[in-house]
Amino acid sequence: RRQRQMCIRDRITLGTGLGSGFVSNGEMIYGHDGFAGEFGHIIVERNGRECGCGRKGCLETYVSATGIKRTAFELMATMTAPSKLRDIAFADFDASMISAAAEQGDPVALEAFRYTGEMLGRALADVVTVTSPEAIFLFGGLSKAGKLIFEPTQWYMEENMLFVFKNKVKLLPSGIQGKNAAILGASALIWQQENK
């Protein structure tokens, strides 16, 4: 309900990739060609990780279930700290394993979440500068990690925020989670178009 009452809000999906949508006064912003909101494909690291879109350094290569998996493997190559993650083959590895390890205090997993939160928080600070939302809602698999992703994201977002926006934008978990989110979102868009 609180999502519907806000004038401007941004929604970020942290799943296998990174999806997003920008809503203003209850209306989805599509842009002139329907592709507005491709937040996952902003460049956050020049000549960074290769993305499926063909570019390098896209946000979703750092801030998604796939991105945090890549981060954890990169960290295992550079960190000497013991980690339960070292015993798992890359093909068998997923974000839920990183989350479970972080909950148990695994230093590699904790650093993977900190770094992921840093990348997301810095990017969200830029989005706030452009969209000036009342709130940003995170949902999707990676957001289920709770404070592991929300705390560093909030900290880095505030740390990099333009001063006029500091401490004014809420970062919240979406009330809609799981497989129903996409179905409900698509249904709402169709309903909205039919009732114009």
Name these PLM-found stretches.
Residues 3-10:
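Conserved small/polar residues in nucleotide/adenosyl-binding loops
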Residues 11, 41-43:
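Conserved hydrophobic/aromatic beta-strand scaffold that supports enzyme active sites
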Residues 1, 19-22, 42:
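Adenylate-forming
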Residues 10-17, 21-23:
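Short beta-strand segments
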Residues 5, 28, 43-50, 55-196:
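ATP-binding/phosphotransfer module of carbohydrate and carboxylate kinases, centering on a glycine-rich
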Residues 35-38:
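Structural signature of FAD isoalloxazine-binding scaffolds in flavoprotein oxidoreductases
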